[in-house]
Amino acid sequence: MKTISENASFRGTQGVYTHRSTACNCDMTFALFLPEEAQQGPVPLMWFLSGLTCTHENAMTKAGAQAWAAEHGIAVVFPDTSPRGEDVADDDAYDLGKGAGFYVNATQDPWAPHFQMWDYIADELPALLGENFALDMDRQAICGHSMGGHGALTLAMNLPGRFTSVSAFAPIAHPTTSDWGRKQLAAYLGSDETTWAKHDATLLMAERGFDGPILIDQGTDDQFLDLLKPEALAEAMAKARQNATLRLSLIHISEPTRPLYISYAVFCLK
C-alpha cells in the first residue's frame, strides 16, 4: 500500500491511498478519514459507497462528512466504484464499465478479469484496512448513494452481523426490474437472472431482510425516481416488518452524504 496524500482535517487525518488489488487485478485507490481518537486506539468505521461515474474523491471532497465523523470519533472509508487502468474494460455508456462496477463479481467477458468489486469491498479492502489502520472492525456501518446505496443494502443483507446499520440515499432499490440494473447485471453476470437476485435489495428484503436498522432517504422530485424504484423496497420492508425508516423529501438534496447518515451510524455504533 502506498500513501498518495495525508492532510489534517478537523483534528483528524484525511488520507488517500493506493494498493495492488488481487481481487480486481489492478491498482485500486481509496480514501480514509481517521478522527483524532484513532491516535489512541481503534475507532468504529463507516463505509460510504458512491454512485455511477464516481471515484473515491466525490463524497470525500463534496459531502462534508469529515466534520461530523470527527465530532463523533468515527472513521469513514470512501472506496472507488470500479477497477481502473488502461487494460481494464470499459464502455462508451456512463452506466457500464469504469465508474459503474455495480458492486458485483463479473462472470462475463470482457468484465470478469477485473470487475470483482463484491470481493473487493466485502473481503479484500476490509482486511487491508484492519491490518494498516486503527479501526475497530467489529463496529462497522455502511451507507451509499444511488448505485452505492444499492451496494450498501445488498452487502448488508448478504453479510449478516457485519454492519450495525445500513443507510442509503436514493438507492437503486430494485435493479432486476430497472434499466439501472438489468443492463448492468446482464453484462456482468450473464442472462441467467437467478444469479441477479443476491444483488437486488428488494428481493433480498423479501427473502431475508437485515438484522439491524435501515434508513432510506429519497427525494420525491428525483429525476431518476422511475429507475430507483423505492416504492418496491418500501413495500418489501413493510411486508417483512423490517426495522426501517423511509424518509421522503420534496427536495432532492444534491450532496451525497448528509449529517443524518453520520448521526444514524453513530447511534447504531455506540
Task: Place the predicted regions along the sequence by residue.
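Non-catalytic cap/lid and distal C-terminal segments of serine-dependent acyl enzymes
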Residues: M1-L250, S254, R258, S263
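Hydrophobic alpha-helical segments, chiefly the membrane-spanning helices
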Residues: Y264-K270
